């Protein structure tokens, strides 16, 4: 018999479980191939109970992305602290893990997924997401030992997302790109990003 009443603590645990399982499935399968049913069944609750936490699939996705942000930052710091890795190796490994997010439990939205998700967000929800995104990428830069002014954060955000999204887009969304060269393209972009960041780290260190 299904449980009728949940305490507030139990509800909080269920909500956390939905986000954790949702993030896991979304990162592995993508937004379009992950259903609400898969998530609530994995947690062991009903469809109705799921919607008492998240009124739409999109609202769960946004919350899952927010859950992911501090985890990504912890991962970046772990690489920075690894004595076996040089600065370049740590940054390269971090960016590579993000570009191949589905293999590393990191949710990266494709172009189509971004369009589908954000056209359904309110202006306020979109503004909040952008603020959190800017804060995340600024924190990542600071984790790398680089000063995070607005212009620098904006550029780092764009060039990082460009590498991640292009990798996900070949060949389905970008059919004119050569799929056999996709990995080499990602490696080239990551090296270019690291080459751009390294002098900024030295500049920040000398101040």
Predicted features and spans:
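Hydrophobic/aromatic residues within well-ordered alpha-helical segments
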Residues: 14, 57, 64, 68, ...
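Hydrophobic alpha-helical connector segments
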Residues: 63, 77-104, 157
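Amphipathic alpha-helical segments used for helix-helix packing
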Residues: 89, 99-124, 138, 167-176
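Basic, helix-initiating cap at the start of DNA-binding domains
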Residues: 1-29, 38
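An amphipathic alpha-helix adjacent to DNA-recognition modules
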Residues: 12-20, 32-33, 53-77, 92
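Helix-turn-helix
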Residues: 25-59, 63
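C-terminal peripheral helix-coil segments that are non-catalytic and often amphipathic
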Residues: 1, 135-146, 162-207
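Amphipathic alpha-helical packing segments from all-alpha helical-bundle domains
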Residues: 70-77, 119-147, 151-155, 180, ...
């Amino acid at each position: 018999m299904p449980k009728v009443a949940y305490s507030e603590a139990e509800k909080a645990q269920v909500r956390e479980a939905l986000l954790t399982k949702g993030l896991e499935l979304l990162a592995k399968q993508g937004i379009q191939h992950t259903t609400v049913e898969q998530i609530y069944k994995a947690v062991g609750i009903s469809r109705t109970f799921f919607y008492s936490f998240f009124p739409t699939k999109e609202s769960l996705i946004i919350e899952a992305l927010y859950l992911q942000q501090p985890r990504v930052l912890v991962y970046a710091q772990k690489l920075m602290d690894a004595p076996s890795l040089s600065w370049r190796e740590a940054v390269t490994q971090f960016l590579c893990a993000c570009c191949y997010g589905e293999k590393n439990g990191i949710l990266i939205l494709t172009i189509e997924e971004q369009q589908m998700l954000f056209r359904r967000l309110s202006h306020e929800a979109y503004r909040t997401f952008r603020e959190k995104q800017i804060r995340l990428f600024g924190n990542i830069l600071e984790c790398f030992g680089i000063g995070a002014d607005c212009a620098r954060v904006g550029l780092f955000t764009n060039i990082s997302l460009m590498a991640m999204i292009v990798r996900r887009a070949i060949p389905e969304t970008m059919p004119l790109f050569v799929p056999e060269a996709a990995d080499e393209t990602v490696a080239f972009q990551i090296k270019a990003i690291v080459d751009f960041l390294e002098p900024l780290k030295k500049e920040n260190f000398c101040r």
